[in-house]
């Protein structure tokens, strides 16, 4: 038994699955997901410009 032959006999990569035909519901769902993704990115960009939200929590003081 040589070192080349040892180990798994299966290939490391699985063969790619055939892409199925998408019906109208799938197309509409994908489109809605893309729109939601764009909306979330816009909200994140707008929120990242501001400072911390609700800064009136418990304030930690230094050593007492």
From Swiss-Prot:
Coiled coil (UniProt feature): 21-50
Record's keyword annotation contains Kinase: no
Region (Disordered): 1-64
Biased composition (Basic and acidic residues): 27-44
Sorted UniProt keywords: Coiled coil
Family designation: Belongs to the TMA7 family.
Protein name per its UniProtKB record: Translation machinery-associated protein 7
The organism of origin for this protein: Tetraodon nigroviridis
């Amino acid at each position: 038994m040589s070192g080349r032959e040892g180990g798994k006999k299966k290939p490391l990569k699985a063969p790619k699955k055939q892409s199925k035909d998408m019906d109208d519901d799938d197309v509409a769902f994908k489109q809605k997901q893309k729109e939601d993704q764009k909306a979330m990115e816009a909200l994140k960009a707008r929120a990242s410009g501001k400072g911390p939200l609700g800064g009136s929590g418990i304030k930690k003081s230094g050593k007492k």
